[in-house]
Design a protein with these regions (language model features):
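Hydrophobic transmembrane alpha-helices and their immediate loop junctions
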Residues: 1-252
């Protein structure tokens, strides 16, 4: 199982370019340390995914981070998604404690480990901090509102981050990271209708058994981890009935 998932690791072409540049600029040791930390971090996500028997599509190693892509439903229970998101940072902390215990920590490792840990917890999509933030907001309000609260929070945070880069700590690597994050944000905004329809279609096609139920006015108010009764005038109908009308009309 482990070997099978290790074969899903894909190296981004830019990774090789950064490896070459770091070797000719005397920063190859730092690049290796950075990459090891990224690998450990992603293995945290992978481990959590395997515990929940979620299929891993691919593990992408970038020159400035990693990305584990799972084949999991949008309607996965929030606690499972939370554990998957938090296991990356947790593995980093455990790895640091292990190295500290055997007296193998140095200033380079401490610097990069702290940077990756704190940066990754920023509420910027698609970082873990954004996923954790989105899970918290999903506990409070609907899926649709949560998505846009997370999106606009990401924009505000990335603007503040750009300010820090420009006026406090100009760094080419950070600028490349910002461009990657902006690209992902734009993609997330463009894909919202697809994601929302997938959220609804999953609920129509599958029988999710949620212990909590609430009455809502329309599908825009649907929440994760809840089943719903929709009030239409003086009549109450199940979410399945509403979704059947929506998707049956589309297929005709």
């Amino acid at each position: 199982m482990i070997i099978k998932n290790l074969l899903k690791i894909k190296i981004h072409p830019l990774f090789y370019l950064f490896a070459f540049l770091s070797s000719i600029t005397g920063l190859f040791y730092e690049f290796v340390i950075f990459t090891i930390i990224i690998f450990v971090h992603e293995m945290g996500h992978v481990t959590a995914g395997l515990l929940f028997k979620i299929n891993i599509k691919k593990i992408l190693i970038l020159p400035f981070g990693g990305l584990t892509i799972f084949e999991m439903p949008i309607n996965i229970r929030l606690y499972k998604e939370f554990l998957i998101a938090v296991m990356g940072p947790l593995f980093q902390i455990i790895f640091w404690l292990f190295l500290y215990k055997i007296n193998y920590c140095n200033s380079v490792f401490n610097y990069y480990n702290t940077f990756i840990l704190l940066f990754n917890l920023l509420p910027i999509y698609p970082l873990d901090g954004s996923k954790i933030f989105n899970i918290v907001i999903n506990k409070i309000t609907s899926f649709k509102k949560s998505y846009f609260v997370t999106f606009y929070t990401s924009i505000i945070t990335i603007i503040l981050f750009i300010y820090v880069i420009i006026f406090k700590n100009y760094n080419l690597s950070l600028i490349i990271i910002v461009f990657f994050l902006i690209k992902e944000l734009i993609k997330g905004y463009i894909n919202f209708n697809f994601i929302f329809n997938k959220f609804l279609l999953e609920r129509y096609k599958n029988d999710f058994h949620f212990s909590k139920r609430r009455v809502i006015k329309n599908i825009n108010s649907m929440k994760r981890d809840y089943s719903h009764i929709i009030k239409e005038g003086n009549k109450y109908v199940t979410e399945k009935e509403i979704l059947r009308k929506r998707f049956d009309n589309v297929s005709k």
